Amino acid sequence: MKVAIQGIKGSYHHRVALEFFGKEIDILECLSFDDLADLTHEGKCDYAIMAIENSIAGSIIPNYSLIDDNDLHIIGEYFININHNLMVYPGVDFNKIINISSHPMALLQCKDFLKKTDKIIVEDRDTAQVAKRIRDKNIKDTAAIAGLEAAEMYGLEVIKTNIQTIKDNETRFVVISKSKSKSISNNPDKASLKFILSHRNGSLANILNILASHDLNLTKIQSIPIIETPWKYSFFIDTTFSNYKKYKEAIKKVSSQSEMVKEFGVYNNFKS
């Protein structure tokens, strides 16, 4: 089984892939979410792991559009606690460090810690990639922010642990595929959808009332501008349910009240 991840081995995406699918998988490394979406859309992997939101930094909005624009399907989700650590080439003193480098999302999640340093903050494409580069090139003036898996895999020394601003730092990942038939959920109880509404007063409230009347629990709503139409928005939602039949009835009714509805996937709620 081929599973694509954003980043390289030792990254948080790699950890999710191993925990979700097990160790007997072939990992395909992608250095950007765009590359990940392209690889999945082209059918070069069976599944892909994509971070979608974080409890500190919020939604990764471009990733919603990548799933939508590439007609990808969400077949599962996974949550992990993110514990960021500062790591250096073995033996290097923190006072000798000039730069601290990591993925922009990791830097944002460690904002309070970074404010207290006099180091130059450098954005990079992946947490684990920075760690690997430090080791491969014997870089001694740069520290990486990454997970413990990266430190262990690339032989770096961890000098500060759990440097994220909020200690309960959780990230939600979705498991995506090109084909809906690759779904691995037998009894789905969560769905991800997109809908577009007209500019009528109360149109959004009407949709929310339909969901509530069918016993659907809205767990996420994210508005995203429609580029071609200024000041018009599409809504991406996650909803949980206990009765699949009532869910389908609700979506049928929502479709009649919306300009368009698109279902990205039904799957098992990780939190249930």
Q: What is the predicted role of each segment?
A:
Residues M1-S272:
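Domain-level signature for soluble enzymes in the chorismate/prephenate branch of the shikimate pathway
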